[in-house]
Amino acid sequence: GSEMCIRDSNNPVTFNEKLQWLKLNDRKPEYTEMVDKFMAKKYVASIIGQEHIIPTLGVWSHFDDIDFDELPTQFVLKCTHDSGGLVVCKDKSNLNKKAAKKKIEKSMKTNYYKGGREWPYKNVKPQIIAEEYMEDISGNGLTDYKFYCFNGDPKYLYVSNGMDNHETARLSFLTMNWEKAPFGRSDYLEFEVLPPKPTKFDEMVKIAKSLSGGHPFLRVDLYEINNKVYFSELTFSPCGGFMPFVPEEWDAKLGEMVNIR
């Protein structure tokens, strides 16, 4: 809330305050590589292996440089510096290129550093990548498992569904035992029935540990696709460090887990 500004910013207490503090005080060159959607693949593969990486089909600086004839029938376009501009193409012959261009070009203009002072993004060169279209045989779309890791220790995760429509989206925080966590987010409805635990959950936890070691806080996002674990992305400041927790005291409880000294 607004009381955040009144507190001494050099003595952060809550989770959100500590993420704000880290934004200003914890700046390492490799962070740029870790949040760049193209470069992160190489970084992550060097730690957990190439088999967990969704293949890249191409990288471009401008939408008009994309040679669609070179791409397969199905693919995904995204911007390397932004989590908003996502174009999922299931059938190239039906792709609305004009709409895709508009979405990607809007995303290319977003700068997380200017918007939320998220330093890792400051030096990310905005590019467009095409990735292989991944589909789970269940046909239920991909579920993202987002692990909240504190110095290499995953304590909670959240799963979400249908995030493209805020009214019907569901989001729940879970413990490492796949039980409902004692907190949530005030801006999303929770699942009434928890989604099933992924079959490769233990492997996911191991991967989250390997990728988050040495960082006071890191969110590690993973997919399970056809019983295989794939890397999604790494995030230093979820919600830019303005996560609306309910009950509110969990902002401070999670803050205790972030060791910044």
What are these model-predicted stretches?
Residues 1-6:
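Short, small-residue-biased leader/transition segments that mark boundaries at the very start
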Residues 11-93, 99, 106-119, 127:
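A conserved helix-loop-beta module that forms one wall/lid of the active-site cleft
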Residues 41, 64-67, 83-88, 97, ...:
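Short catalytic/ligand-binding loop motif for oxyanion handling, primarily in non-cytosolic enzymes
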Residues 60, 81, 132-134, 149-151, ...:
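Short, flexible loop/turn elements at secondary-structure junctions
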Residues 60-65, 133-136, 223:
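Short, solvent-exposed loop/turn elements at beta->coil junctions and helix N-caps
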Residues 71, 95-187, 229:
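Phosphate-binding site of ATP-dependent enzymes
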Residues 123-128, 171-229:
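A long amphipathic alpha-helix within ATP-dependent nucleotide-binding catalytic cores
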Residues 206, 224-261:
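C-terminal active-site "lid" helix and adjoining low-complexity regulatory extension at the edge
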